[in-house]
Regions:
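Soluble metallo-hydrolase cores and metallopeptidase-like ectodomains found primarily
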Residues: 30-84
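N-terminal signal peptide
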Residues: 13-31
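Active-site/substrate-binding loop(s) of hydrolase catalytic cores
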Residues: 80-92, 96-228, 279, 325-344
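Active site of divalent-metal-dependent phosphoester/diester hydrolases
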Residues: 144-145, 241-268
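Active-site-adjacent mobile loop/cap segments within catalytic or ligand-binding domains
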Residues: 200-202, 208-224, 260-371
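Classical eukaryotic N-terminal signal peptides for Sec-dependent ER targeting/secretion
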Residues: 1-12
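Phosphate/oxyanion-binding active-site loops and adjacent basic polyanion-contact surfaces
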Residues: 34-38, 60-64, 96-100, 180-184, ...
Length: 371
């Protein structure tokens, strides 16, 4: 088969374009961990954290190449000391990469940071870092706005409490064909149920919010003691770490109903008295402390602040990333903005968000231990 010169040139241009776009994409996400990197680091945790950690790796039913990791932390040196149980979950929605990074950093701090040892004296942890690995890999490969799993199901609408199938299947909050129809949801539910924790954290991004139940209704929590305990600590965290965060019920704060979600299941079905959903980043809101960090960094590196801000306003990273998104509810321009909305795209912002909310997470756990 012979190709014309025009065809050969076209193929060459397409090949170069794909290579350049992939290079730009990798550069844009260079400080985010990929799924293979996360898996490798988790596999090596026992050798770094002994005797504190054990790993349960479950092979996915969808492919033998992927595993779901369930990490347990405890301090066996104090076996008779009463401890609280804390369950932390991230990665349900693949495009929310910063949520996974926060929890991954928290795991490493439990292993290596002496300031975190007191948490292991008082708590047993069970942590799922990357709850939707196949979806996450698609995001890493350029499909930057994916919220669902490989079956186009939102696994945080697939829980068997107040589940509803009113959402059309082509929308990104598709709840699935039935409650717990998805392997990811079943995996999380089994781990959460068997652990029976005192506290549950589900970490996300997209807004700034520190939420307690409910997400499916605007009704208040009936148990006033539990409601007050959750509101008290969330308001403390808001004041110290996120002054513009919404605090309260997501349904009430956002005027938006989320059926079949893990937050309400954890609280109403499993009776976990401290059930939280944290939203830790949104591009739409300026974080005063973060802006100060950026200004300090600009001065430190002798960069013209006005030039930097002008470049950022032009979305210089995203405009150069041609992508193929599977979501049908976004326009092309919205797709290009999507990853930037859910995740910080510069290193200063990335480091600040992780450090800031990690401190908030530690303080929340300390509060729970004292009550």
């Amino acid at each position: 088969m012979k190709f014309s010169i025009k065809t050969i040139i076209t193929i060459y241009i397409i090949t170069i374009t794909i290579w350049i776009s992939k290079t730009i994409r990798l550069k844009a996400f260079s400080f985010y961990h990929t799924t293979p990197q996360i898996d490798s680091l988790l596999e090596n945790l026992p050798s770094q954290c002994l005797p504190f950690v054990s790993i349960n790796a479950t092979v996915s039913k969808d492919t033998s190449l992927l595993k779901y990791y369930d990490i347990s932390f405890n301090n066996p040196e104090k076996p008779n000391q009463p401890k609280d149980k804390v369950f932390i979950l991230s990665g349900e929605h693949p495009r929310e990469m910063i949520a996974v990074e926060l929890v991954f950093k928290f795991i490493n701090s439990l292993c290596k940071d002496p300031e975190y040892l007191h948490l292991l004296d008082k708590n047993n942890f069970r942590i799922i870092v990357n709850a939707n690995p196949k979806g996450r890999i698609n995001v890493e490969n350029g499909e930057l706005c994916i919220r669902t799993n490989i079956h186009d199901v939102d696994i945080n609408r697939n829980w068997g409490y107040r589940w509803s199938n009113e959402i059309k299947p082509n929308q990104e909050e598709n709840p699935g064909s039935a409650p717990f129809s998805e392997v990811e949801t079943v995996f999380i539910k089994d781990a959460l149920t068997s652990f029976n924790p005192k506290a549950f954290f589900s970490i996300h991004s997209g807004v700034y919010g520190l939420f307690h139940p409910y997400a499916y209704t605007m009704n208040d929590i009936v148990n006033k003691t539990e409601a007050n305990n959750m509101k008290t600590i969330l308001n403390i965290i808001k004041e110290k770490y996120c002054k513009h965060c919404y605090v309260g019920s997501p349904a009430q704060m956002l005027r938006y109903y989320s059926y079949g979600n893990c937050l309400d299941y954890a609280y109403d079905v499993l009776k976990i008295p401290y059930s939280f959903a944290w939203e830790i980043f949104s591009k739409k809101i300026r974080f005063e402390a973060l802006e100060e960090k950026k200004r300090e960094n600009e001065l430190k590196h002798l960069i013209n602040p006005l030039k930097v801000r002008k470049t950022q306003d032009k979305q210089f990273i995203l405009d150069n990333i041609p992508t193929s998104f599977i979501e049908k509810t976004y326009t092309e321009s919205e797709n290009q903005m999507c990853v930037n909305h859910f995740n910080p795209m510069d290193r200063v912002s990335y480091d600040f968000i992780i450090s800031n909310f990690q401190k908030g997470l530690v303080e929340t756990i300390d509060y729970i231990n004292s009550h």
